[in-house]
């Protein structure tokens, strides 16, 4: 499963994202994070058990401050 997440860039953002994934016992197989002009773009490839686990992850990520957008790609 591949997700693209946009945030207003800030310190400890990557930590917050990985903690959200870890809390659901999901594995990250790849992560690419870039920042440009105050916007952080993060593309994560995850091992997802089912759609319910994905929805729980989206809910957790939506609670992270400064979220702009999250989408499945």
Name what the model sees in each region:
Residues 1-73:
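A conserved regulatory-domain signal marking ACT and ACT-like small-molecule sensing domains
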């Amino acid at each position: 499963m591949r997700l693209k997440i946009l945030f207003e860039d800030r310190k400890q953002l990557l930590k917050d994202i990985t903690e959200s994934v870890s809390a659901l016992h999901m594995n990250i197989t790849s992560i690419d994070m870039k920042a440009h002009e105050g916007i952080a773009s993060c593309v994560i490839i995850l091992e997802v058990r089912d759609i319910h686990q994905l929805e729980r992850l989206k809910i957790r990520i939506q609670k992270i401050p400064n979220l702009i957008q999250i989408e499945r790609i």
